[in-house]
Amino acid sequence: YEIPLRLVGSEMCIRDSIIPLTINDSAWNLQYSPYVYYNEHCIVFNNQHTPMKIERATFRKLLDFVGLFPHYFVGSNADLPIVGGSILSHDHFQGGHYEFAMAKAPIEKTWVFPGFEDVEAGIVHWPMSCIRLTCADDTRLVELADKLLTAWRGYTDESCFIFAETDGEPHNTITPIARMRDGKYQLDLVLRNNITTPEHPLGVYHPHAKLHHIKKENIGLIEVMGLAVLPSRLKQELFDLADVLVAHLPTAEYPEALQKHAAWAEEILAKHPELNADNVHLILQDEVGHVFAQVLADAGVYKLDEAGRAGFVRFLESVK
């Protein structure tokens, strides 16, 4: 996977300029983010202070937006805790003039939904579980996306540890992304589930504890699409880790701030006997990318193995 990396702080700021828009016959605004995680990174938000919710109207709004700005993508964070990823509770999207790694990923398995033979559909070859829909008629995409959302909200497959709800708490939702592709509308629907267990109290489909030294935070829209938004602490930690790796310092002697990376450091040294002062930073960047790929795999509800692929197909077959 082509995985760009970004190190960020904790505060969200937005430039002052506001561009009014009409999407789904309602008043929205566009602002550009100073973070610039990617080219022309923008926030699109509802004039009315309404809670974020993934529903049929969400797909209509996303497709209206890319109809206005066909060179932009736009997407929404999911609407449940753990898998949401947003620090804003207000109804909003994120967009920009950028092609993420997930957008470049090919279809792994094509699919035809009954009654929607005019919609190109399939499973995307990506660590997270993504259904891609493409059609020249955006209303058809809205109809099929809504059908898939409704089906997923109520779907349980115990053999894949997918439960629609436990004790009345809903677990299933979708992270949707829209774009134009060769003159057609396209939606990527990423299946999400926020169930927790004693073994994984932060989420079964969330970065597992072994990876928390790199990424512990929620996997939101930007990460889903393949851009690693990493905690700012890593900038100094990786520089310091490079020094101790080159010096072959025993992990027991690592500074306290680097102890969390000790097991990973041993894996890196075993994997890269050629490591030296000239290549250590490139090696670390590459290895962080591998960790982030595993982060996405942890967040995927259907794993990239035989059982996961079979489970994904069972869900698609259930959509009538």
Task: Please tell me what each predicted stretch does.
Residues 33-48, 123-127:
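Residues forming anionic-ligand binding surfaces in small-molecule and nucleic-acid pockets
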Residues 1-14:
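Short, small-residue-biased leader/transition segments that mark boundaries at the very start
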Residues 40-41, 46, 83-100, 190:
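Histidine-centered divalent-metal-coordination microenvironment in nucleic-acid enzymes
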Residues 57, 70-86, 95-156:
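Catalytic or ion-translocation cores adjacent to nucleophile or general acid/base/metal-coordination motifs
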Residues 122-320:
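C-terminal accessory/tail domains of diverse enzymes
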Residues 81-89, 167-173:
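Beta-rich nucleic-acid/ligand-interaction surfaces
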Residues 16-35:
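Conserved oxyanion/phosphate-binding beta-strand-loop segments in alpha/beta enzyme cores
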Residues 17, 49-74:
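Helical scaffold of the NTase/Pol beta-like nucleotidyltransferase catalytic core
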